[in-house]
Amino acid sequence: SGCAVNVGRGGYQAAYSVEEQIFETREQLRRLFHFTSGRGKNVIFTQNITMSLNILLKGILKPGDHVLVTSMEHNAVMRPLVQLQRQGVTFDRIPCDHEGNLILSEADALVKPNTRLLVCLHASNVCGTRMPLDALGEICQRHQLYFVVDSAQTAGIVPINMDKMHIDALAFT
């Protein structure tokens, strides 16, 4: 009808209808990515992945926290981390070899007592290599770290099982 709907605030039928559609979309996404530990309310929509990652990083990290990233990270992760560095957040890069494959054996040694989270892309937008999410998720579980994954290149194409991979937050478009 061309009329704007104010979801979550309007008390009219069109607002309720759109709210139901949004909730069902959240549930479908939750099922697609095997996020069974939560409900659709744990699925949020933002303008894009960069905004999602900024909200996550700036919302979770505090001065004194340490973060692990891969040496392949996109600027959507690195720019907010560099900003947070000025506020006392530190980070280390898990190295990759010359083909872009993560050198997983070095990850455990980079974990510090103040390491709070590991954030990584699922697949490189430059060379296409995929990060071993299962193994990284195990490291996060072992060290009780948040695990944040940027799946810009893979969401909906490569299967992602958030529960099995121990992923706490998945950013995608």
Can you say where each PLM-predicted feature lies in the sequence?
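Pyridoxal 5′-phosphate
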Residues: S1-T173
